A protein has these predicted regions:
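Sec-dependent bacterial lipoprotein signal peptides
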Residues: 1-18
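Exposed, flexible binding/inhibitory loops of compact, secreted disulfide-stabilized domains
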Residues: 20-163
């Protein structure tokens, strides 16, 4: 009987230690950093906030897409060959997130974006707000970009949130 009590006490203490030592890492959420005037001006000029057709200055198709850009070569491949001058981005320290969200109508406002990093993936979170009032039913592309401190290269998911 004494051995059974000792074994029970040992198992209970072991269970307590395991339950208190949670090794799961929290997901890390990061927000875009301030971009230079040159970078902001480039995207203001070449990337509309919304359009009824995919942006011709970038290599987007006709669906929602997100590009995680970590080099000048990747940026060059994402833009039209008619754009000669790219903004100076230090890709040793930064990552550019660039994309389009295909929506059912133009009645949305883009509110914010962030990226969550976990062990397996990057998740780009996009938050839109539904505007009040009637809007025509026409496919509309919303565009976004964000400059981040260097992000790890991992598979990417998109989380589109409409409020």
């Amino acid at each position: 009987m004494k051995q059974l009590k000792s074994l029970s006490a040992f198992l209970m203490s072991l269970l307590l230690m395991v339950s208190c030592s949670n090794t799961d890492k929290e997901d890390l959420e990061v927000k875009p950093i301030a971009a230079s005037g040159e970078i902001s001006s480039f995207f203001d000029k070449h990337l509309p906030s919304q359009s009824s057709t995919p942006a011709s200055d970038f290599s987007f198709g006709d669906k929602s897409e997100c590009m995680i850009i970590n080099s000048v070569d990747e940026l060059r491949r994402s833009v039209s060959s008619q754009i000669d001058k790219l903004p100076a981005i230090d890709f040793t320290k930064n990552t550019l997130v660039l994309g389009q969200a295909r929506m059912s109508d133009p009645g949305f406002s883009f509110k914010k974006q962030s990226v969550t990093i976990n062990d397996n993936t990057l998740t780009v979170h996009l938050k839109f707000e539904k505007n009040k009032g009637a809007t025509p039913t026409v496919i509309t592309y919303f565009y976004y970009w964000g400059l981040y401190d260097k992000l790890p290269e991992k598979p990417t998911d998109i989380d589109l949130n409409i409020e």
